[in-house]
């Protein structure tokens, strides 16, 4: 029998482990039905967020339905090498001319929405595919995205705990980039909230 995304997430919570499930188990041979995909909001569309976005877009079990960042669209983000983020985005969009006349490092929620929609449009061969919402405030996102399964927290470090706790209290599973928090008391609150809400959580350590 097929396993829906919610059955899978519920089982992960009950067992307390993270399991990698083959595609054919989730949705039949080589295909995952849209209703069985894990719907994800990507919170934080800066340098590190875009560095890790491509892997999520390419995952057939995941559908990014929303992005969030207080910044709309700019090209003044810090990066480790010249044009590194722009070139990464070009690679996973299959578009070598993406923003060719724009200098600097791109970031912001509208850039995130543009990239997510462009990736899925290319995947579906639909020129105008639009399915990703963009929010300036993560609290508004959590209120409006009723069918959301999980969030990935890619904000600056000082917001990790705040966003994660708010998401867990809404019953959303949380994937968080390190660190859990900047302060010990906040880290403890994150762990306590995870135990109380019994949602699935995972911390991405350095290099993972």
Which residues are covered by each model-predicted region?
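A contiguous active-site-proximal alpha/beta segment in oxidoreductase catalytic domains
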Residues: 173-175, 180-208
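N-terminal glycine-/serine-/threonine-rich beta1-alpha1-beta2 phosphate-ribose binding loop
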Residues: 1-170, 188-200
